[in-house]
Amino acid sequence: MDGMPDAIAWRDVGSIDDIPPLGARVVVAPGGNIAVFRTGDDRIFAVDDRCPHKGGPLSQGIVHGARVTCPLHNWMVDLASGEAVAPDSGCTRTIPVRLDGRRILLSIQTGA
């Protein structure tokens, strides 16, 4: 180990048009599946595709506003923070995401 931090790379994972409004898409990544969400007002969020409660697939949940409801036990997760909405508690990892025109880019750590 040389003490150097891992490099950050932006990975193109498709077009915003590939995800319906209030929908999601799964991106397979080395660290596990990532759920990429599109809100009704075309905001894009990305989180680990695992509910902090029992590991349910958030990508199969219902998107409302900037939240998703897990399909297993109806936990709500804030897509911006990854935090479960009270009274539930827990957190799923968020992944930096940006739009370049209509292209969705995820920030993926790579070994430098």
Residue ranges and their predicted role:
Residues 65-71, 84-93:
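Short cysteine/histidine-rich metal-coordination sites, predominantly Zn2+-binding motifs
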Residues 1-65, 91-112:
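N-terminal pre-ligand scaffold of iron-sulfur
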Residues 51, 70-73:
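Short cysteine clusters
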Residues 57-64, 75-86:
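Iron-sulfur (Fe-S) cluster-binding segments and ferredoxin-like electron-carrier domains
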